[in-house]
Amino acid sequence: MQYFAVNAMIGKGAYAVPDFPDASSLLGHLDYLGIDRAIVYAVEARDASPYLGNQALLEAIAPFAERLLPAFVITPSNTFETGVIDWLRSQAAAGHRVFRLCPEVCRFPVRQIERVVAELTEFEPVLLYDSRFSGTESSFRDLEDLATRYPSIRVVICQQMWGGFTQVLDLMWRCRNVYLDTSWLHMRDTIELVRDHFGIDRLLFGIGYKSHYGAAIGALAQARISAADRELIAHGNLERLLQLAPPPAKLAPEHPLLAQKPLWKRFKDGHPLENVTIYDAHGHNGPHARGWVLATPDTPEILDILVQRMDQYGVEKLFVSDGKALFGDIVVENRRAERLAERHPGRFHGYFVYNPLYADDV
């Protein structure tokens, strides 16, 4: 299957040791994972100068133009810089229609980007919003305003994890031109939930940090969706937004190390792992009302679903802490969780939830 990632980055910046200091290092990572193409932005454009960093990006990825496509960082200052808006418009006219918003790092509220976006709307731009786990409430209100005022734009929420996830779902409900990438969706059954409520076309494939390696690929491979829907998320939806045809064949070569990694090959093909004992050391059960969004609210049913997922992935045991014990009566709820786990002998081991407010109860 082909993969087209929406949120890669290259370059050295002020705030972290880079995963990918240059285009070649990113391409090596994409090859290792079997990812054919990626939208990439320059850290220099985010941390220092958008205009100079965007120009340097084009030069850096030019030798790999078949596989690396640019995303240009934009900021409100572009409006006041001589020639920058004209340059952005010329790039959009040439087909480079992806732009990235990094308001927290670039120090501006989202609403201030409107003058720049207004200059680009005729090109149906794709705006990548850098959420980094959880964007602010004001940012999401500003994104709603932009998406409503300019229906020709496409807003993609990137790197969104469970924190504040309800505001993403709310924004997708309010605005049909808002999309979500899969890079940080480290929550159970989220791909299926978004599909059921908003349609499979609203999901785009993305990768996280280098340390994530194939997490997003594995999540997509194991999602309970059709093969056709999997292809749409992996590359088809982004190709449609950018009006690009898929390559006639995979661009990522088969990495020689994969021959030594039969477990990974089996998992990314959608099968459970075999001939290896796996204990998952960090899980939760019980109802959730603190940012998590799950279709099943009842604890006994959640345990049944967890066992189904464990069997699907090849996990033998799961170590869990109980949600109700975390936020309620530690004695009653820890005991209740233990009784519920007995319905699946040997599959669950519990972390005893302790709250010093109730030390005398233990």
Where in the sequence are the language-model features?
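Acidic/histidine-rich helix-loop elements
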Residues: 10-21, 284-300
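Hydrophobic faces of well-ordered beta-strands that scaffold small-molecule active sites
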Residues: 3-8, 38-40, 69-74, 97-101, ...
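Mid-to-C-terminal alpha-helical segments outside catalytic/metal-binding sites
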Residues: 1-10, 19-37, 200-202, 212-277, ...
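Active-site gating/metal-coordination segments in enzymes
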Residues: 36-37, 45, 52-128, 134, ...
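Histidine/acidic-residue-rich catalytic or RNA/ligand-binding cores of hydrolases
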Residues: 14-18, 138-144, 165-172, 190-197, ...
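Catalytic pocket-lining loop regions of alpha/beta-barrel enzymes
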Residues: 98, 105-204, 255-257, 264, ...
